[in-house]
């Protein structure tokens, strides 16, 4: 399989446009996470102090709306075509970003919630970019094509690296302006570069609501939804809440580290760097998890990844450790969650090969809902106990349930659809 085939076997401009659209959309989707502290300080100067629960709600809303909108945009792709759906969704995102910028320091908490809902359209881009890129290419190139088009998780790393510094120099609202300008640029590129595949290349098979309801009656749909709610939900939940967690827990240590080793006086910028480090592990190791699952089997791989997350989450909740060890534990948690994402999607195509479009939407929605629940749980833990141990214990409990679930389904999977699946189960 050669990258050169991508230019001759399909429509490379569409693949490139889909990659840019998804990558920048993911960056915009998670933008509030690295700005939460700065926005909170801005609201406080106008007399509104966000509680831990309110801060968690603000961070969770883009994840929640993105989860639901994945299914909505999936229907849009079937009815309007991928290109029109993407342009409409991107328009909403651009409007939300410009609104946030122009309101700036005068924006209210309620207005921020509406902006957060608008950013959910960016998170739903997954449901548009992947199908559009895949339509142009033959089955033998689908893995490579979807891997490239879906490599947008790295966008959140860019947020944490650059957003706090931009906010320090020009104000947090300037990050919204940068996001709006970049999104507008991508909108124009996408409008000129992307094309929906013609009928002789791809024959659409529009899905009905009944198709979704039919799959919801299959118990394996719910098992996969649970597993992805833990893996992707854990990844996106921790990613969005990472800076808030670090600032509330290790602000003194990060301040000292920044001054001594980085020459950086702004602890919020230092928190962004450490957040980027941990998130990078989960973003970059997703394909590694898929490769491990190909070799060992998805079930065994999930045992390993979820087992590691369970131990690490309990460790983080119970052991009083140094800042350096805490970052190491968070790094490993994110790494294993990222690899678990790859392992889940090593199994899904083998079980639902004929319904991958629907399953991607359903499981993606479950992942977003899991992320929303994790953010709210961490916010509740901080508000109720002035710490995060309870939140990590609850997350560990959900991971334990997922491990029990894997134990319950592994024999049935391996002796039924796994026999003819063609890959290791």
Language model feature labels by segment:
Residues 91-105, 307-321:
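C-terminal ends and interior cores of transmembrane alpha-helices
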Residues 141-161, 364-374:
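Glycine-rich segments within core transmembrane alpha-helices of 12-TM secondary carriers
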Residues 148-194:
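Helix-loop-helix hairpin linking two adjacent transmembrane segments in secondary transporters
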Residues 181-200, 402-410:
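C-terminal membrane-cytosol helix-exit motif in multi-pass small-molecule transporters
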Residues 191-213, 415-424:
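Flexible cytoplasmic inter-helical loops of multi-pass small-molecule transporters
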